Amino acid sequence: MEIPVYNASGEIIKNISISEDVFGVPFNEALVHQAFVAQQANARQGTQSTKTRGEVQGSSRKIYRQKGTGNARMGTNRSPVRRHGGVAFGPRPRDFSKDLPKKMRRQAIRCVLSFKLESGELKVVDQLSFDEPKTRDMAKILAALQVMSPTLIAVDNPDTNFIKSARNIPAVKTTPANLLNISDMLRNKQLVMTEEAVRQVEELWGQRSR
């Protein structure tokens, strides 16, 4: 399997062979969905909390006697129906994390990478290096590649100049190749990778590296 490599001017300079184990996997929608949901769930802190009637400050004394006042019966001030009372059935701290087997996580990554390639949403450039931070230069490269936003750019070793050149462009996100994940790839229409990033991904997510 071969894929064209572009330069900064958007011209094809060569073709490289890529691993079918990583970029030629049939798309499994159920698996990708499960991996995406697990990643989103694992990102939740689960620390939101409310106080019950047993935790709010205040007396537990009955406000007035049960009968003879003409008013509706009422207990403590900490009742959920009273102002400043406790919260009934409010959120409590909980663990939202979901376990996903390692083989399933790895296969889901391969599925999305293969889908990006098959649908024409993956482009490979020879390199993305800048002598100084220049947002204009990065914007020119993306325009030459004719990529559609939102765009995810993955490089093997991002430096400060590269990060600063891309961070002010709307709908453009950068990431190290070894941190590619389901959520970022699905949330961004286009995936741009350097040639070295492709090799790093093949080494990391290939069938032989477990």
Curated annotation (Swiss-Prot):
Segments of skewed composition (Polar residues): 41-51
UniProt xrefs under InterPro entries: Ribosomal_uL4 (IPR002136), Ribosomal_uL4-like (IPR013005), Ribosomal_uL4_dom_sf (IPR023574)
GO cellular component, one term: ribosome
One of the record's GO molecular function terms: rRNA binding
A Pfam short name: Ribosomal_L4
Gene3D superfamilies, A to Z: 3.40.1370.10
Subunit structure of this chain's protein: Part of the 50S ribosomal subunit.
Function description: One of the primary rRNA binding proteins, this protein initially binds near the 5'-end of the 23S rRNA. It is important during the early stages of 50S assembly. It makes multiple contacts with different domains of the 23S rRNA in the assembled 50S subunit and ribosome. Forms part of the polypeptide exit tunnel.
Name the UniProt record assigns to this protein: Large ribosomal subunit protein uL4
